[in-house]
Amino acid sequence: MAKNYYDITLALAGVCQAARLVQQLAHQGHCDSDALHVSLNSIIDLDPESTLAVFGGSEANLRLGLETLLGVLNTSSRQGLNAELTRYTLSLMVLERKLAASKGAMDTLGNRIAGLHRQLEHFDLQSETLLSAMAGIYVDVISPLGPRIQVTGSPAVLQSPQVQAKVRSALLAGIRAAVLWHQVGGGRLQLMFSRNRLVNQAKQILAHLTPEL
């Protein structure tokens, strides 16, 4: 069966978007708020109609992730910040495979996300309450699967409990996107052998987005 590289690229962009948000938060203490909302919302939607629906039904919602994906797949730019993004992206993929192999962790994750739905009836998605709850899910369910993702950035920034909660929430969104990536036919071998197809697909999607003003 032919693989759907459109869906695979969207899901991979979701992983890369989460990685970019983690990087922005760790270095600056803040990030692209709209992109964060899209990524966090993807955690909540467990019964989407399509891959694109996971990310709010609009390709533009993944602009940051698609641009990051092109940087990660550009092998000539594996220095500095791009090396960080590549490490985060690959680490999220490794953790997702460990999650998939643990039925207990998957069941717990589903139950905890159902709890987020109840909290959303009373609190906003980016409220401290929800961010703390999502960070707690990452710490309790994902981190023990190991190996832990080493987040690098400004030590002063990373000491902030609010930044820590956002970083862990973004990592949870990255895991969600990595789960989706495998569901639609993604796999690690594509990063080696189908790199050009992924790059071309990402460029095609970006090309017909309206330019940012």
Swiss-Prot record:
Q: Which UniProt keywords apply?
A: Cell inner membrane, Cell membrane, Cytoplasm, Membrane
Q: Which HAMAP family match?
A: HflD_protein (MF_00695)
| Family according to the record | Belongs to the HflD family.
Determine if Cytoplasm is one of this entry's keywords: yes
Taxonomically, the superkingdom here is Bacteria
For whether the record's keyword set contains Cytoplasm, the answer is yes
Gene Ontology cellular component annotations, sorted alphabetically = cytoplasm; plasma membrane
Organism whose genome encodes this protein: Klebsiella pneumoniae subsp. pneumoniae (strain ATCC 700721 / MGH 78578)
Task: List where in the cell it is found.
Answer: Cytoplasm; Cell inner membrane
Designated gene of the protein: hflD
Topology in the lipid bilayer is annotated as: Peripheral membrane protein
Cited InterPro entries:
HflD, HflD-like_sf
Indicate what this protein is called per its UniProt record: High frequency lysogenization protein HflD homolog
Principal location class: cytoplasm
> A Pfam family name for this chain?
DUF489
